[in-house]
């Protein structure tokens, strides 16, 4: 009986190590894999899956002064005959000031093995610590100087073409109550024209 229990624990330990190894391997493979530029219409991921379930990182700023945060609100589509990506950032978030100060932002998608890293990036503020280092990400910069990440499998670079804060007076009662109860700053909507899309 003791031998069976010992073997069982050993099997569990091996499975755990294998899962950790697979996660590491996925990140390492993507880190070394070159980006391939595609058109916005060639994005294959389901938007609802990509935004609401997988989560994304929105980043703004330049080398030496940038920030990123995890988002699960957003949309992709067409406006004024331009392909667009829309993100929503609360005024209480550190990323908000970077979105205001910069003309561009990027949206990046990561493999499922990185979900715990995205949870960390959504939980911790860049005011308090170096989130990029904490998540073990490798920052790369586009020709326009905007941050994307070597461990991501999709990167979307946008030029900000419209920004406006939600009008509290026009919010549905339940949403207005949510802002009042949580103390979260009312979100800004940022619409970005998609300039470049890269995948791995």
Name every feature range the model reports, one short phrase each:
Residues 2-8:
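Sec-dependent signal peptide recognition
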Residues 1-2, 186:
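Structural motif marking the loop-to-transmembrane transition
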């Amino acid at each position: 009986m003791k031998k069976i229990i010992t073997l069982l624990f050993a099997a569990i330990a091996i499975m755990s190590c294998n899962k950790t190894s697979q996660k590491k391997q996925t990140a390492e493979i993507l880190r070394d894999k070159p980006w391939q530029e595609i058109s916005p219409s060639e994005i294959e991921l389901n938007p609802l899956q990509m935004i609401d379930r997988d989560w994304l990182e929105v980043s703004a700023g330049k080398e030496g002064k940038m920030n990123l945060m995890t988002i699960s609100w957003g949309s992709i589509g067409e406006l004024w005959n331009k392909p667009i990506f829309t993100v929503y950032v609360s005024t209480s978030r550190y990323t908000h000031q970077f979105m205001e100060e910069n003309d561009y932002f990027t949206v990046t998608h990561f493999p499922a093995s990185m979900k715990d890293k995205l949870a960390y990036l959504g939980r911790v503020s860049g005011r308090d610590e170096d989130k990029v280092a904490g998540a073990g990400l490798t920052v790369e910069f586009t020709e326009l100087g905007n941050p994307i990440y070597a461990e991501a499998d999709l990167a979307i670079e946008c030029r900000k073409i419209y920004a406006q804060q939600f009008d509290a007076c026009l919010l549905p009662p339940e949403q207005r109550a949510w802002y009042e109860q949580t103390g979260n700053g009312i979100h800004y909507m940022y619409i970005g024209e998609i300039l470049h899309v890269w995948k791995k």
